[in-house]
Design a protein with these regions (language model features):
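Short, structured coil segments at secondary-structure junctions
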Residues: 47, 55, 99, 130-132, ...
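Short, well-ordered secondary-structure micro-motifs
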Residues: 42, 72, 87, 114-118, ...
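Intrinsically disordered or low-complexity boundary/linker segments at protein termini
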Residues: 28-33, 53-88, 184-197
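Charged helix-capping and loop-helix junction motifs
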Residues: 44-47, 89-90, 119-122, 174-179
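Residues at the starts of beta-strands that form the adenosine-phosphate
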Residues: 3, 72-73, 100-104
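Redox- and metal-dependent alpha/beta enzyme cores, enriched for Fe-S-associated oxidoreductases
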Residues: 86-130
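Hydrophobic alpha-helical segments and helix pairs
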Residues: 13, 17-63
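Structural beta-alpha unit
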Residues: 1-29, 130-180, 184, 188, ...
Length: 197
């Protein structure tokens, strides 16, 4: 059961969202996306990127021209650096169970083997997805944005899911860059889940 509220506030968007979250008013942010420049290619405006980067709960960013379709095929790129748990994957599991979706877990690398930590996290992820349809994919010599674009040419994806794993300043910069690059060509909804829920 869902409840929706309209709130008018004299505050910045991100500050208001943070205050609402701290007051336990919401557990998902849904945003329409349209770039501030008016160019169709610039999907994520600065508000959307800022909310995605700083939100303490999952954010679903929906392109302005998107017409609803059931998320039957979900793309979930991962570097396996996150210690996965059921709480972190709740949104994906809920969607997958409701729509009978299949999750494509995509790992992009430059030919390096997974570390011991990454292997353990991958195994944990496999265990968490054991009751839903899922496939693991691995691609070499591509960055994340290239891998996502190329994968979408092969499989009709209805939802892209990313984990915002901002442990350090460098990773935070990398995530913003990835979001901006993905936002340039994305025509499907993007669900971003903070790694610390």
């Amino acid at each position: 059961n869902h409840s929706f509220s309209k709130i008018s506030s004299f505050n910045t968007l991100t500050n208001e969202i943070q205050e609402l979250h701290e007051g336990n008013v919401m557990d998902l942010i849904v945003m329409g996306t349209k770039g501030a420049s008016g160019l169709k290619e610039v999907l994520f405006g600065s508000n959307t990127v800022h909310v995605i980067k700083n939100a303490k709960c999952p954010v679903l960013a929906v392109p302005s021209e998107f017409v609803f379709e059931s998320p039957r095929e979900i793309l979930f790129p991962s570097d396996y650096e996150v210690s996965f748990n059921e709480k972190l994957l709740k949104q994906i599991l809920d969607i997958t169970n409701f729509y009978n979706s299949r999750v494509h877990i995509l790992n992009a690398s430059y030919g390096y083997d997974l570390s011991e930590k990454q292997e353990k996290n991958k195994e944990k992820l496999e265990g968490l997805f054991k009751k839903v349809a899922h496939l693991f994919h691995s691609v070499s010599n591509q960055n994340v944005t290239e891998a996502i674009s190329n994968f979408q040419l092969k499989v009709r994806i209805n939802l892209l899911v990313l984990i915002n794993n901002k442990h350090s300043f460098f990773e935070n910069l990398f995530f913003k860059s990835t979001i901006n690059q993905i936002g340039f060509h994305l025509n499907i909804p993007l669900l971003v889940i903070p790694s610390k829920l």
